[in-house]
Amino acid sequence: PAGRMTALMGPSGSGKTTLLDVLAGRKTSGAIEGEVLFAGQKLARGALRNLTGYVEQFDTLIGELSVKQMLMYTAELKLPPATSRADKEVRVQRVITKLGLEGCADTTIGNVLQRGISGGQAKRVNIALALITQPRVLFLDEPTSGLDSHMANEVVQSLHALLAEGRTIVCTIHSPTSKAFALFDDLLVLKEGKLAFGGP
């Protein structure tokens, strides 16, 4: 439902990422049984992808760019060609503010050879990339993996703040802290590809 955040949990190999891929219209191989409905309507895969954003488990950032440059690059790729540069800049600044990235907007992202932004900031930049298109539903695969408990809490708090816009958020999450877990509205637990538990 709109304005709610759902945690998707289960052991490795239980089908969490596969389920996210199906829901986001990203699954292109294998048989899919059943239907994916959006607000009670069946949509074509392309329409579904236009309404959703997806954040992969592993960072997909270009280390040589600054945070703002990375977001502008993504805006150039994802937004319609008719979108003016000024409008793209407004969107980029908006997601920078939403995710608390103002302090590192002009910092180089970095890589193994070049120091850059922190792990928590990198996760929030990945979330910002998905928000450029203003999706109504945001799917995230393990957004807190590789982070210490403090950074993981910050990332989940950033996601929770996005609910105020009526967005729906679904994320796979492994061993969340009690503080992070308390921010989720609903929990789905998968086991061997089947729903073992679903509820608030």
What do these predicted ranges mean?
Residues A152-E165:
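Helical segment within the ABC ATPase nucleotide-binding domain
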Residues A130-L131:
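ABC ATPase C-loop
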Residues P1, A24, I32-K42, L48-N50, ...:
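Conserved ABC transporter NBD signature motif
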Residues L138-E142:
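Catalytic Walker B motif of ABC-type/P-loop ATPase nucleotide-binding domains
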Residues T6, T17-S29:
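Short, conserved post-Walker A segment of ABC-type ATPase nucleotide-binding domains
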Residues M9-S12:
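The feature captures the beta-strand-to-loop junction immediately N-terminal to the Walker
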Residues M72, E76, D87-T108:
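Conserved ABC ATPase "signature" region
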Residues Y54, F58, G63-P80, R91:
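Q-loop/switch helix immediately C-terminal to the Walker
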